[in-house]
């Protein structure tokens, strides 16, 4: 089946944070671990034929959380208009519990690592009322010069803010599920004492 473009469709996907200016960096301001920068409600168009939020919409919500984070450390519409942005290079989502229509979501984000042009971030999605963890989203993000079509180092001012965030976030214990590969994990059969003794003779 081939889908066609709806005449009423938006010309492109829009972020929840478009049009909002980035926050000026204040070295004296406290940095929370994790940062809580985005909240939303599960929308009707996010719900699939199983009656819960579709898997693609988890990435949509994590993307909005990333956009809120970008704005926090200095990347906004003006920055992108000047020719640079951040692109996703890799994403790993863990779906832990269902998110249902109308439920409130609370997102947190931690900066796990960085270098001169890449960020390793870890998002966590929670039910805003019960606090239950619904999903996690781990991303490798790359700073890009959109005119040159290649990765580029962060400007010094943004790098200083990112270094401050990373220094604070590195104080907390590492996220236990960060960096894990997808696999079917099977239980290893236990070896009985009798078998082990017999084999060793």
Task: Explain the meaning of each model-derived region.
Residues 2-89, 144-201:
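Hot-dog-fold acyl-thioester-processing enzymes
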Residues 40, 118-120, 138:
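Short, small/polar residue-rich loop motifs at catalytic or cofactor-binding pockets
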Residues 44, 123-125, 141:
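Generic short beta-strand
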Residues 62, 123, 137:
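Conserved GNAT-family N-acetyltransferase fold
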Residues 69-119, 134, 201:
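Hydrophobic beta-strand-centered segment that forms part of the acyl-chain substrate-binding groove
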Residues 96, 126-128, 144:
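A generic structural motif
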Residues 135-137, 153:
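A structural microfeature
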């Amino acid at each position: 089946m081939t889908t066609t473009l709806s005449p009423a469709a938006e010309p492109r996907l829009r972020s929840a944070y478009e049009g909002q200016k980035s926050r000026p960096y204040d070295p004296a301001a406290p940095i929370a671990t994790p940062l809580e920068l985005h909240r939303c409600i599960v929308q009707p168009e996010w719900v699939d034929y199983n009656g819960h939020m579709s898997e693609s919409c988890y990435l949509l919500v994590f993307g909005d959380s990333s956009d809120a984070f970008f704005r926090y450390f200095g990347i906004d519409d003006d920055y992108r208009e000047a020719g640079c942005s951040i692109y996703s290079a890799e994403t790993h989502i863990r779906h832990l519990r269902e998110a249902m229509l109308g439920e409130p979501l609370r997102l947190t984000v931690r900066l796990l690592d960085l270098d001169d042009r890449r960020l390793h971030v870890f998002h966590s999605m929670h039910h805003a009322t019960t606090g239950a963890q619904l999903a996690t989203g781990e991303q490798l993000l790359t700073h890009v010069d959109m005119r040159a079509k290649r990765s580029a180092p962060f400007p010094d001012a943004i790098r200083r803010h990112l270094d401050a965030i990373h220094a604070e976030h590195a104080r907390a214990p590492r996220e236990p599920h960060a960096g894990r590969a997808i696999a079917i994990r099977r239980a290893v059969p236990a070896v009985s004492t009798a078998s082990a003794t017999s084999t060793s003779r």
